[in-house]
Amino acid sequence: PTGHYEWVSAPFGLTATPSAFQRLMTFVLRDHIQAGYCVVYIDDVCIFTKTDDPGEHLAKVEAVLASLAEHELLAKGKKCEFFRSEMEFLGFMVSADGVAPVPGKVEAIRQVPPPETVSQLRSFLGMANFFRSHLPAFSEVSAPLTDLLRHTTGGRQRLQWTLECDQAFQLVKDMLTSAPLLRHFDPGLRTAVH
């Protein structure tokens, strides 16, 4: 084969691809992000308005799509959802009311058995950590579980599971399955930092 070849899409397997693509998307959509109506995570783009005016929302969607087209980036129509009042975005349900974990994930959490190995515990804590913004005092509640990891070496090593560990595990599961809806920030309300 002779000639010049170049990628028309991001190649799989290159370790720098996600960070490079994130940087590209942030650059391309910077004006919309700074205007406060667009959120981007790699190839997931969320465009939102604070009013129920479909004309305002359409204008913002068109502006974002124009910015993408200007940089020769395409959005696949079958992967797009338009004019939704509620949607799943990065593992959360986002609506005008706020942000909450996706109900299907909550049900899966209820079914998780107590971990038996270091690897299973790390997996559970990683999943719980993803939702930590919804879990008040998460680090204190999960302390017996994270302390258990300090005394281990390998992923297949069996855990020295105690009653305290079991109570912490059940409490974290309960917190995850009843995680509160996080309201969108309102600068007009009193703000408390804990």
PLM features: residue spans?
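Retroelement reverse transcriptase polymerase core
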Residues: P1-H194
